[in-house]
Amino acid sequence: MAVARSLRSGESGPRTGSEIRTAFLTFFAERAHQVIPSASLVPEDPTVLLTIAGMLPFKPVFMGQAERPAPRATSSQKCIRTNDIENVGRTARHHTFFEMLGNFSFGDYFKQQAIEWAWELSTEVFGLNPKNLVVSVFREDDEAEAIWRDVVGVNPKRIIRMDEADNFWASGPTGPCGPCSEIYYDFKPDLGNDDIDLEDDGRFVEFYNLVFMQYNRDGEGNLTPLANRNIDTGMGLERMAQILQGVPNNYETDIIYPLIETAAGLAGLDYQKLDDKGKTSFKVIGDHCRAITHLICDGVTASNLGRGYIMRRLLRRVVRHGRLVGIEKPFLQAMGEAAIALMVEAYPQLEERRKLILAELNREEARFLETLERGEKVLADVLVANPQMISGGQAFELYDTYGFPLELTQEIAEEHGLTVDLQGFEQAMDQQRQRAKAAAVSIDLTLQGAIEQMAAELEATRFKGYQVLEQPCCVLALVVNGESAERASAGDNVQIVLDTTPFYGESGGQVGDHGVLSGEGSGGNGVIVAVDDVSRHRNVFVHFGRIERGTLALGDLVNAQVDRACRRRAQANHTATHLLQAALKQVVDSGIGQAGSLVDFDRLRFDFHCSRAVTAKELEQIEALINGWIMESHDLIVEEMSIQEAKAAGAVAMFGEKYADVVRVVDVPGVSMELCGGTHVANTAEIGLFKIVAESSVAAGIRRIEAVAGPAVLAYLNERDVVVKELGDRFKAQPSEIIERVISLQEELKSSQKALTAARAELAVAKSAALATQAVAVGEYQLLVARLDGVEGAGLQNAAQGLLDQLGDATAVVLGGLPDPSDEGKVILVAAFGKQVIAQGQQAGKFIGSIAKRCGGGGGGRPNLAQAGGRDGAALDGALEAAKVELKQSLG
């Protein structure tokens, strides 16, 4: 193994990736830094799809929007970036997935301490020779240069000043910002200190970046010193591993190389003997497998939107590069197993979610292999017909009709020396967006903006709803018609913020409470507000409602009263949701994790990660378990404790969710224990009854169970009774006889359909027998193109095959028709080619697929017999005439 040879066995200090990570965190933990576990790749920041930097989880702290977790922190954060995806595998250090080691100061130590520790860590812990190190500073940062030169003792010739584009960090056009300083490793120090060019990545690699957040930039670009200065640093784990292990690139470190070896073994190749192109494919596989394994683990499933699209794109690139190196069979499960084994020590959750990860890899790989097979056939025809460029329309058709990603079309085109008309593709995509606009739903941005502004300016609402359902409160803010207001009158739809509230605000899947606000009001004649929703914005509770009577003004005192019946129903459904998750884990799979939920007053919905449908028998078992727990009358225990205590006690958390240091734990002893901020019954008996009403798929790898509990079960059963009674009346059968009656009718219908199909087939054969006389001679060949309506696809194929058998191997038969002559929206086309026609280079599948496009469709099949379909019956005669002309030209 190349990596094993490169590791400096016998030398002291960290060398492996695991040792480097541990050494970094230990170094800063010993210097009073709190070790923060890696956050999910799915960030809380809604403006970012994925966690792209080690500092991202701390961004709210740096921006002054959240409390600091500690004065000092350190972490090893998993990250994903895809902006340079085309460079992955082609350069020594580009990756999609990487780990960023970092140390952070939130208003504590600053520039000199950060620089001194960075140097100490690099030279004394990691053992890097100072002669191999070069540092960069911002061109105007005299302070940093002086520290490097006078305090640390770096040779002035190895301190390089850089421009703002390289060495000045900013969170945006305005806000916190500051200069950076970077440490580079010099692989060729013998070249001296003259004309150092840090852009020469063959000689230098940046491995440690120090950001000094010391300024605030206003709208005019002016910089003013921050009252609390911060430190944000990042060291690339993969880059440090390359340096310490002495290998030519990051891919051949012990962090990634085992995955490359696994893939090479599956391909039956020796990686070290491959040319650059072959090695690139294995590097892509190794890199992307790390990324997709962690993405699935963090709850991302493949889709055509957002982070789901990123995961799908990475996974499909893995499959594509696997085929390029000769891996034809499905192999992602093997790669997933290898990735989990490689990274599980640092990320134990990979083992916990192993089944989910492997199931998602298998499913998406199988789906893409089907897409790839279809798309590659079509793309092959496009490549032959377009020797220089693939048009935007063709690329869009591949994307829209066959699910073939644009990036993949570009890659394959590049391999053949072609380009893709990207502008044309975007035009086609834009036309599709315009067509979809009719279905778009707009959001009241004016109202949303007013609420967000209001929430940002107010202190957190004191929530009393766990203890009481009625509470005197003071009106702090009002929004009327999307604008902040001082008063509102009867008939106004309003949004209200109170200093204190018993109303539960929508969160954790549970809907907001309903109820009433009442008081004397500003007019003195009393005010009543009907509250029909409550939401949370930055821990401020916003009450949505309508003023039924009187006038409400800022500062008014009101009595807030929650609708007790609604609250009881929501509580029953929320506790039932916890029992449902516990039952799923017990009956279906202990590794099942929550993907989402809805807790409403009259129903509940639970989404969970699962690679298959829950069987009818399992649903029965789940129902029985839950109703058993309800009848056992378990008292619930609700406690607040530290997140560490909760996890140690076995409390279930929603994966990827970020929790405070102190959490609320809802415990149904011996049954379920979850972290939850929702409202619940005091005893399971209060739920009454539980009934599952549906189980379905909502996305790849995500299932949904819908259910009712309590009084809603009776309403559901009453509705079912009405349906059963109506069916009984229609079928003139007792309820117990309905199923038998339906089966009997189905058998009768099936028999009738079978007889009809047979009759149509006989009719097709009878009609086709007369068609043989219409065959025309084309040189040595026979050509028959005809229209035959009223025949389904199977009958049309039988007719074509019968004509071919009758006319001989030197015959081409093309038949087309409308299965239902009254419906021009469905066209069937069939081609049957004899052996001698096929020998001339004609293939029935390709030929009939191209002809079908004239009818707005497509299709294909075997070289000798193929079927296609279309949607435009009016174009059928023209398509058949085109088929006749093309075959005459090719066979004549």
Curated annotation (Swiss-Prot):
Zn(2+) binds at H574, H578, C676, H680. It comes from the Bacteria. It comes from Prochlorococcus marinus (strain MIT 9303). InterPro entries: aa-tRNA-synth_II/BPL/LPL, Ala-tRNA-lgiase_IIc, Ala-tRNA-ligase_IIc_anticod-bd, Ala-tRNA-synth_IIc_core, Ala-tRNA-synth_IIc_N, Ala-tRNA_ligase, Ala_tRNA_ligase_euk/bac, DHHA1_dom. Keywords: Aminoacyl-tRNA synthetase, ATP-binding, Cytoplasm, Ligase, Metal-binding, Nucleotide-binding, Protein biosynthesis, RNA-binding, tRNA-binding, Zinc. Catalyzes the attachment of alanine to tRNA(Ala) in a two-step reaction: alanine is first activated by ATP to form Ala-AMP and then transferred to the acceptor end of tRNA(Ala). Also edits incorrectly charged Ser-tRNA(Ala) and Gly-tRNA(Ala) via its editing domain. Belongs to the class-II aminoacyl-tRNA synthetase family. One of its GO terms (cellular component) is cytosol. It is an enzyme of class 6 (ligase). This is Alanine--tRNA ligase. Binds 1 zinc ion per subunit. GO terms for biological process: alanyl-tRNA aminoacylation. PANTHER family: ALANINE--TRNA LIGASE, CYTOPLASMIC, ALANYL-TRNA SYNTHETASE. GO terms for molecular function: alanine-tRNA ligase activity; aminoacyl-tRNA deacylase activity; ATP binding; tRNA binding; zinc ion binding. Consists of three domains; the N-terminal catalytic domain, the editing domain and the C-terminal C-Ala domain. The editing domain removes incorrectly charged amino acids, while the C-Ala domain, along with tRNA(Ala), serves as a bridge to cooperatively bring together the editing and aminoacylation centers thus stimulating deacylation of misacylated tRNAs. Pfam families: DHHA1, tRNA-synt_2c, tRNA_SAD. It is found in: Cytoplasm. HAMAP family: Ala_tRNA_synth_B (MF_00036_B).
